[in-house]
From Swiss-Prot:
Keywords: Cell membrane, Cytoplasm, Membrane, Nucleus, Obesity, Phagocytosis, Secreted, Sensory transduction
Protein's UniProt keywords contain Cytoplasm: yes
Gene Ontology MF, one: intraciliary transport particle A binding
Bias (Acidic residues) ranges: 196-205
Function: Functions in signal transduction from heterotrimeric G protein-coupled receptors. Binds to membranes containing phosphatidylinositol 4,5-bisphosphate. Can bind DNA (in vitro). May contribute to the regulation of transcription in the nucleus. Could be involved in the hypothalamic regulation of body weight. Contribute to stimulation of phagocytosis of apoptotic retinal pigment epithelium (RPE) cells and macrophages.
Biased composition range(s): Low complexity: 70-87, 206-220
Name of the protein: Tubby protein homolog
Main location: cytoplasm
Subunit-structure text: Interacts with GNAQ. Interacts with TULP1.
Family in the record: Belongs to the TUB family.
Keyword Transcription recorded: no
Length: 505
């Protein structure tokens, strides 16, 4: 058998050499890429690269549109990619020190596009918080799974399903359960320690629904709570349930303390008409009802030919004489007009006989009012102290029937004998630069400034308004009082504010 000349098989050897050179060049390029990637990894060992497959899909339509070409590119180049992946595996066996095979050209290009779209290449910014991508352990587990085996193209096909699932969840449809996702991820070699967006979304939905339920509380519960708070809070600023006060007996109502937790709202009108009404006007007290009607309670007028200011108070607006049957009490001041005492219709102890002293018909002292000038001088607000009898265990007024000057309310207060008495004071007003006046918060019940406006409080509870009085028109005033005052006490205190005070004007 004769051998062929060399010229017959030389061309075949040339083709073989060219094919081997091409393969060698391709291997050299891939080896260079692998060494470059390893060098980059050694330079940045702590950097965790963004993973386009493991990163949670945002439910925005813009990101879904950006992810759509990724699926098409992978599907269109699946054949060549599979071939290059096999070559990468063979190259990984040649390089024993490699920890991660080089990504194929098409896959690398597509992953680079996805990474640039997820990090700094696009103007789109990721939200801080739980949508930061996968956590550290999940990403490291993916790197380990890719180093142990070939790159799985199925993870790209998964993105289309994940995108559809994300759009369904955003549209309010049924979301895939966390167990199915865990099974799929474990089947693909992804760590199960990854946090699921579905579970977090359920937590968000539950928290938002609970917040919505707390914001949209039933009106009945809110109203019940506000009613209880209004009943417990003594301040008239708190909303109170509308209560119609029934007045059967005027004299009994005028002497009965106000119910606890209820503010008695009244109105005082001043009548200056007539020959001497300018000097001695008549004052009428009416009860303001919730239905807008007014109920007459008391009337008072300053007596003529009296050494000191002396106001008679009656339950009959047409009979203001001391000897009448409607006479219920009086208000009397000292010579300077700074100290006032409120009495009922009892007998004066100085004019009473021995039998009268023992019969218990002596007059009671219901209140004492003391006015003083403020530290700012005569132009400042007046300082006001109110002394009333104390209350017993059954919320009844303690009877104080003094037989001499040493047993009066003013004497007890001046001697610091606070047994069986309650000391009240006016609330200090605040200077307002806008109105250039001293103001108090009357919660809409007083509309005009006046030196006669005041609020009575207790020193231990400044938020509890025992009584307030103020002007709303030329001859119209509002008067609101609370426990432990009665209508006669409050009306007499208001009358003391009308009277002129030589030492305080």
């Amino acid at each position: 058998m004769t051998s062929k000349p060399h010229s017959d098989w030389i061309p075949y050897s040339v083709l073989d050499d060219e094919g081997s050179n091409l393969r060698q060049q391709k291997l050299d390029r891939q080896r260079a890429l692998l060494e470059q990637k390893q060098k980059k990894k050694r330079q940045e060992p702590l950097m965790v690269q963004a993973n386009a497959d493991g990163r949670p899909r945002s439910r925005r339509a813009r990101q879904s549109e950006e992810q759509a070409p990724l699926v098409e590119s992978y599907l269109s180049s699946s054949g060549s990619t599979s071939y290059q992946v096999q070559e990468a595996d063979s190259l990984a066996s040649v390089q024993p020190g490699a920890t991660r095979p080089p990504a194929p050209a098409s896959a690398k290009k597509t992953k680079g596009a996805a990474a640039s779209g997820g990090q700094g290449g696009a103007p789109r910014k990721e939200k801080k918080g739980k949508h930061k991508g996968t956590s550290g352990p999940a990403t490291l587990a993916e790197d380990k799974s890719e180093a142990q085996g070939p790159v799985q193209i199925l993870t790209v096909g998964q993105s289309d399903h994940a995108k559809d699932a994300g759009e369904t969840a955003a549209g309010g449809g049924a979301q895939p359960s966390g167990q199915d996702l865990r099974a799929t991820m474990q089947r693909k070699g992804i760590s199960s320690s990854m946090s699921f967006d579905e579970e977090e979304d359920e937590d968000e939905n539950s928290s938002s629904s609970s917040q919505l339920n707390s914001n949209t509380r039933p009106s009945s519960a809110t109203s019940r709570k506000s009613t209880r708070e209004a009943a417990s809070a003594p301040s008239p600023a708190a909303p109170e349930p509308p209560v119609d006060i029934e007045v059967q007996d005027l004299e009994e109502f005028a002497l009965r303390p106000a119910p606890q937790g209820i503010t008695i709202k009244c109105r005082i009108t001043r009548d200056k008409k007539g020959m001497d009404r300018g000097m001695y006007p008549t004052y009428f007290l009416h009860l303001d009802r919730e239905d807008g009607k007014k109920v007459f309670l008391l009337a008072g007028r300053k007596r003529k030919k009296s050494k000191t200011s002396n106001y008679l108070i009656s339950v009959d607006p047409t009979d203001l004489s001391r000897g009448g049957d409607s006479y219920i009490g009086k208000l009397r001041s000292n010579l300077m007009g700074t100290k006032f005492t409120v009495y009922d219709n009892g007998v004066n102890p100085q004019k009473a006989s021995s039998s009268t002293l023992e019969s218990g018909t002596l007059r009671q002292e219901l209140a004492a009012v003391c006015y003083e000038t403020n530290v700012l001088g005569f132009k400042g607000p007046r300082k006001m102290s109110v002394i009333v009898p104390g209350m017993n265990m059954v919320h009844e007024r303690v009877c104080i029937r003094p037989r001499n000057e040493h047993e009066t309310l003013l004497a007890r207060w001046q001697n610091k004998n606070t047994e069986s008495i309650i000391e009240l004071q006016n609330k200090t007003p605040v200077w307002n630069d806008d109105t250039q006046s001293y103001v108090l918060n009357f919660h809409g019940r007083v509309t005009q400034a006046s030196v006669k406006n005041f609020q009575i409080i207790h020193g231990n509870d400044p938020d509890y308004i025992v009584m307030q009085f103020g002007r709303v028109a030329e001859d119209v005033f509002t008067m609101d009082y609370n426990y432990p005052l009665c209508a006669l006490q409050a009306f007499a205190i208001a009358l003391s504010s009308f009277d002129s005070k030589l030492a305080c004007e």
